[in-house]
Amino acid sequence: MSLRSHEAAACAVIAIGVCGVLVGSLLVESMRNGQSSAKATVSTAQSTEEIQAQTEPTQMPAPTPEPEPVVQTVHFSATGDNLIHEGIYNQARARGSDGHYDFIPAYENLRDFYAGFDVNWLNQETLVNDDYEPSGYPMFSTPGDITNALYNVGFRVFSLSNNHSYDKGAGGIASSMAHWAAMPDDVVSMGFYNLETYDDYVYQTVNGVTIGYLSYTEMTNGLPTPSGSEYGVVYLDQRDVIEKQITDMRPNCDVLVVSCHWGVEGSHTVTDAQRETAQWLADQGADLILSLIHI
């Protein structure tokens, strides 16, 4: 209804503008006809006035001023990697009770820091679920209680695409996705995509700004996409898929955030391949590229 009202107003402005031009033309024609019929009796001074009336330009309506741009600001933080080794979940188990894990003390000192941002984004490096026993290096699985602590400290956006996404096979993917789907409505997660359509698009609106999120990885520790899984990651070399996803999402968001889990393990040096890929992503339409080094 609101859109239709705006459309009607826009049409009215256009109609008034057109009528103004047409009415002006008709008035000029009326003056010409009247002066022509009295031509034999008018004075020279009147003839001069007639000429001025005929040559005076038609007054056009003033153009509608352009609206002033509205500046909307979103304060954004990005953190990673949240990699939960055995020692961390064992400490949480010792603090917890009734079979639960208490991860809150591990993050509590960061609460004030993250409170200063409108959006807190996190690369969750390990699978999170309660269907698998917790495990650390090299094949990780993290108790679901960790999301209570992460939510408590202020994280609302979670990337799940990284080199440990396939650590527990198809079952791990399904369990982790189910866990994140059960989070509160203000939580968004991305990184596992339907392997047929790849159209699992995620948006978030903050302070009037719509943000779109995509997450990719360079590797999955040598593990192939699990057999029988409907969902999986998108690798950074799948450019046809990435190009389509960006093309689909770009018209629907003000800012498009793309995260990349990549690099040489143990190195902070940016490679030429990373630079080339980042430029390509920007050329496709990415506004912000989050680079997660593989260390």
Residue ranges of each PLM-predicted region?
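Short, low-complexity patches enriched in S/T/P/G
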Residues: 1-10
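Juxtamembrane extracytosolic/periplasmic "stalk" immediately C-terminal to the first targeting helix
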Residues: 39-41
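Acidic, metal/ion-coordinating pockets
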Residues: 10-34, 46-292
